[in-house]
């Protein structure tokens, strides 16, 4: 998986950004023009996709930031062992283990043979929803 580049000024709520090496979803963007000769600054508040931790970024509007490439795929649950879920990709038929999602509404629906949507972001995988 990879990373694209964008400017801070193009970020808006709901977009994705990499802050401190962690892929995050932007929840709030505020822009402020500083004094007479200063460039505009943006304050971005984002939540980590994997940990749920809140992260902030303060940078000039014209500076470059990393945007993660999110690959959305479908898989089928093969087994559910404690805090790990074994999934088979429905296109490539490869099998792998993913950590059990922390969201209770998603975790409660995971059972054998259920179809799930998972995201692969920067080499890490996460179950997002159950069909």
Curated annotation (Swiss-Prot):
It is found in: Cytoplasm. SMART domains: eIF-5a (SM01376). One of its GO terms (biological process) is positive regulation of translational termination. GO terms for molecular function: ribosome binding; RNA binding; translation elongation factor activity; translation initiation factor activity. The modification Hypusine is found at residue 36. GO terms for cellular component: cytoplasm. SUPFAM superfamilies: Nucleic acid-binding proteins (SSF50249), Translation proteins SH3-like domain (SSF50104). Coiled coil: none annotated. This is Translation initiation factor 5A. It comes from Metallosphaera sedula (strain ATCC 51363 / DSM 5348 / JCM 9185 / NBRC 15509 / TH2).
């Amino acid at each position: 998986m990879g990373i694209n580049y964008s400017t801070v000024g193009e970020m808006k709520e709901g977009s994705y950004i990499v802050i401190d090496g962690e892929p995050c979803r932007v929840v709030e963007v505020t822009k402020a023009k500083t004094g007479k000769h200063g460039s505009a600054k943006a304050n971005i508040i984002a939540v980590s996709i994997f940990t749920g931790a809140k992260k902030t970024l303060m940078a000039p509007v014209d500076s470059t930031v990393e945007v993660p490439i999110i690959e959305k795929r479908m898989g089928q649950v093969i087994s559910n062992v404690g805090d790990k879920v074994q999934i088979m990709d429905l296109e490539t038929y490869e099998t792998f283990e993913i950590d059990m999602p922390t969201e209770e509404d998603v975790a409660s629906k995971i059972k054998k043979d259920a179809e799930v949507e998972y995201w692969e972001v920067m080499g890490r995988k996460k179950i997002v929803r159950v069909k």
